[in-house]
Amino acid sequence: MRTLIGADQRTSGKIILKGKEVKNGWNTTKALKAGIGLLPEDRKTQGFMNLSNNYENIAISSLEKYMTGPFTDTKKKIKNAEVYFEEMDVHPRRVDYMTSNMSGGNQQKVILARWMSTDVDIIIFDEPTKGVDVGAKAEIYRLMEQLVEDGKSIIVVSSELPEAMGIS
């Protein structure tokens, strides 16, 4: 999955995106511009910046939206994060809180808010409910359904058979 977003280089095979083969040099910046996001299996080491708060973790993949001259508009990042926290039922509702101090389910919601804020076309969910409680699972499933209803494409990788059957 990480190869699809350019985090790892491919060693064999082809990646075809919108009918065109992705050539060597594929990286995360190009994947983002192509409209691909990833909710990684290991959110703690690959999903968010451990030393950053929630609003920074949501904004990191779309900083151009927050630029005012050479700086980013912190108030705009905070307001954006607050909208997603409300929509996604994130607790605690503190956008200035460190993402690493949140529960697993709420960390997943912060990462998903990043991709929803970035407005990617394809989101890859790699073990999306690994290590999250039942309530957070239900909310993540609801958000996945909402993305599909909004015309987004999702790819789900799950080792949980009931989850895979329920999503398909």
Language-model regions: role of each:
Residues M1-S168:
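Glycine-rich phosphate-binding loops of nucleotide-dependent enzymes
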